[in-house]
């Protein structure tokens, strides 16, 4: 898994790998079913159900966690936050991809979508909007 992997790209790789190896795994199981290990239920962990509400970015997190959160929620439900335009109107903005700048001091959105608008690049609209980085 690469550090820039999104949920969607991971699913595509995992499904392809599973499809390529399904026959081998089934043959191995059928020839030696006792070789399987039972699942250790004490090691289970839970992640809350994904909804559009749980996709809101928490700006109190560190930049690495926010960037990973954005990748994990692509293709659904897509991480989001609020932006303010020059007239001080506030809009919801989905962030499809982002990166941490060179000096590791800021998260830079890449592909975004302002509520009611088409998907675009942040560089094309950042002069009209500013991120609201509070919860």
Where are these regions (language model features)?
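Donor/substrate-binding cores of folate-linked one-carbon enzymes
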Residues: 1-46
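Conserved short-loop catalytic and cofactor-binding motifs
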Residues: 10, 54, 113
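Generic detector of well-ordered alpha-helical segments enriched in charged/polar residues
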Residues: 11-12, 47, 67, 126
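Proline-rich low-complexity regions
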Residues: 37-39, 46-48, 75-77, 81
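Amphipathic alpha-helical surface "interface" segments used
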Residues: 41-50, 90-93
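Acyl-group handling in specialized metabolite and lipid biosynthesis
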Residues: 48-60
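An anion-binding loop in the catalytic cleft
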Residues: 59-135
């Amino acid at each position: 898994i690469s550090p820039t992997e999104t949920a969607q790209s991971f699913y595509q790789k995992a499904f392809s790998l599973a499809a390529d190896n399904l026959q081998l795994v089934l043959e191995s199981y059928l020839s030696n079913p006792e070789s399987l290990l039972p699942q250790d239920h004490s090691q289970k962990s839970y992640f809350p159900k994904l909804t559009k509400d749980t996709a809101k970015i928490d700006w109190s997190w560190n930049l690495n966690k926010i960037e990973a959160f954005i990748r994990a929620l692509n293709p659904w439900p897509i991480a989001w936050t609020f932006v303010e335009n020059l007239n001080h109107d506030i809009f919801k903005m989905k962030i499809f991809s982002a990166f941490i700048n060179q000096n590791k001091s800021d998260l830079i959105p890449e592909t975004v979508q302002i509520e009611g608008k088409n998907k675009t690049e942040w560089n094309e609209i950042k002069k009209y909007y500013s991120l609201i980085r509070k919860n």
